[in-house]
């Protein structure tokens, strides 16, 4: 079964199996398919795709890149360009990225720049990638530890989402993706929350598929209104302004989902402190929703996991200065939450200047709580 979730801003299909020949129906056999993945997924996920492509008469090439966030570098990017050039791959060939956010970010960026643009298909293998990284055409690489500093907007030709692939994920890694689901619920669609009430129910393919579809539609509807990230798309940065700063400081020792989880808690505290959030219980509800999936809700949780020395408040504030949204102020603007399911807007903008005083107080309070124990 192949189900079209939406075709805006680009097609996304929910599929029962990666062996389905129908997946390849729109691809021309005159050009090769270039599968790009890492060595773990080459064993776990790639075989059915390769087998099906070859049985249909496609010529295929496989390129393997290193695993993890540390692979999102110019070295990997240039390696792929050089491999494509060495193999004399024509620009009509389709690149097929098979992996989580890291693989898809790199493959999308290579596709957007090799021969000034090649078609590519995303085959996300993590929940984060299925409901977030594969949607909307943002791609890129890190510069040193600065997240996504070099990149482009380039939409995939298609996204093939196969929920059964997630059964090979460890539970904790699956939960990292739930952080982005909770983000979607809080900024735009509170009706996602009931699907998340019972973690055990997500072991059923039906419930999991429902969760994936609802999140894809939520993100796609936001991105479809603002591909270039000048307006409403900015609400998808909820939790990511502080989250990315923390990821940078922790240099790969915490997952994206964990960083975003704590980022959302801190940014909700900021929304309350600045009088933007209308519901005083919003923080309590958010923390409960995160804890249900064993997601961290404080800096203390992050440091306990990473086992690194505690940063100072000023180190966290200075990491924020690398944020791409930053203009002239000392702090980048933040996405704030008005109520569950509604990100705040201010004078037509979805990011608002933050009070240095309030943010410093919130960070210091969270850091001091660690010293008290």
From Swiss-Prot:
UniProt-annotated location(s): Cytoplasm
Keyword Amino-acid biosynthesis in record: yes
Enzyme nomenclature, EC number: 4.2.3.4
Catalysis performed (reactions): 7-phospho-2-dehydro-3-deoxy-D-arabino-heptonate = 3-dehydroquinate + phosphate
Record-linked CDD domains: DHQS (cd08195)
Major location (coarse): cytoplasm
Superkingdom as given in the UniProt entry: Bacteria
Cofactor(s) demanded: NAD(+); Co(2+); Zn(2+)
Cofactor: binding comment: Binds 1 divalent metal cation per subunit. Can use either Co(2+) or Zn(2+).
GO function term, MF aspect, one: nucleotide binding
Pathway: Metabolic intermediate biosynthesis; chorismate biosynthesis; chorismate from D-erythrose 4-phosphate and phosphoenolpyruvate: step 2/7
GO cellular component: cytoplasm
Binding site for Zn(2+): 180, 240, 256
Stretches assigned to coiled coil: none
GO biological process, one term: aromatic amino acid family biosynthetic process
Record keywords: Amino-acid biosynthesis, Aromatic amino acid biosynthesis, Cobalt, Cytoplasm, Lyase, Metal-binding, NAD, Nucleotide-binding, Zinc
Binding site for NAD(+): 67-72, 101-105, 125-126, 138, 147
Physiological role: Catalyzes the conversion of 3-deoxy-D-arabino-heptulosonate 7-phosphate (DAHP) to dehydroquinate (DHQ).
Family statement: Belongs to the sugar phosphate cyclases superfamily. Dehydroquinate synthase family.
NCBIfam families: aroB
UniProt-recorded name of the protein: 3-dehydroquinate synthase
Organism listed in the record: Chlamydia muridarum (strain MoPn / Nigg)
Gene: aroB
